[in-house]
Amino acid sequence: MVPNEVLEKYGSDAVRYWAASARLGADTAYDEGQMKIGRRLAIKLLNASKFVLNLGATEKSVITSQAQGHVLINALDRSLLARLAYLIEEATAAFEKYEYARALQICESFFWSFTDDFVELIKDRAYGARGEQEQASVLAALATTLDALLRLFAPFLPFVTEEIWSWWRAGSVHRAEWPQALPILEGTLLAEYSAQNPTAGISAQWVLADADPAQIESLKQILPDVAEALGGLRKAKSDAKVKQRTEVESATIAAPQA
């Protein structure tokens, strides 16, 4: 029996999303509401990818070595990729335990934060308004994140990820290597690991470049803190019943001392 009507209504990726949302060993009810969420996710992934690639992110922008990590001169970009490195570790661990529903949940949560917060914060830099170095930094962050997200989402949304992959990468996303976040190593250990695994992927250590690994947790927190401030500004505009694009003359942000 083939559910043609459901597939035509929501798409194959959306139906697969619903199936993947079920916990291993648990009974799962037929739920078109979950399919609607899956369809929305697939469409958003498609549109967000178009936007990122139209900004100028290319395959060459993807960070695959420690040396390339030095292009990341903006703390917000470094924060995003530090969080990405930990997402890869967490999603991989979930898959290894056959907890694919959890892997989907954490990837989806990261993706919505990426599109709703990070992408909204970097548009001026992406268009070159703050100079070439800032533009190169943000394009590297965008390309590296998109590259990893397509690989992570491929088991759940195989058709839309394959379509997006074909826009800027050769071959098939389903034959591409699984993204890997390197262990946080220091000095010669990191150099040795990098030499043996030249295409292993982005790591939190690479994002920090020459910084102390102890700073990683603080670095990870930058993006959510900025996103929280952005959310406060959005709420203030909504409460004032003005358009979101209305300029803010001034804002006071209270935060604990670093």
Task: List PLM regions with ranges.
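Catalytic adenosine-cofactor/nucleotide-binding cores of aminoacyl-tRNA synthetases and other
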Residues: M1-S65, V173, D239-R245
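Conserved structural-core and active-site-/substrate-pathway-adjacent residues in large, well-folded domains
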Residues: G11, L45, F114-T115, P158, ...
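Generic alpha-helical secondary structure signal
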Residues: D13-Y17, S79-Y86, S109, S113
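Membrane-interfacial loop-to-helix junctions in multi-pass inner-membrane proteins
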Residues: Y30-I37, E99, E134-L142
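Glycine-rich, acidic and aromatic/proline-enriched surface loops and short helix-turn segments
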Residues: F51, W112-E120
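Acidic, turn-prone loop/beta-hairpin segments
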Residues: E59-Q66, H70-E89, E120-G232, A240, ...
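Short helix-adjacent coil turns
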Residues: F95-R102
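Aromatic-lined ligand-binding clefts that engage carbohydrates, nucleic acids, or primary amines
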Residues: L104, E108
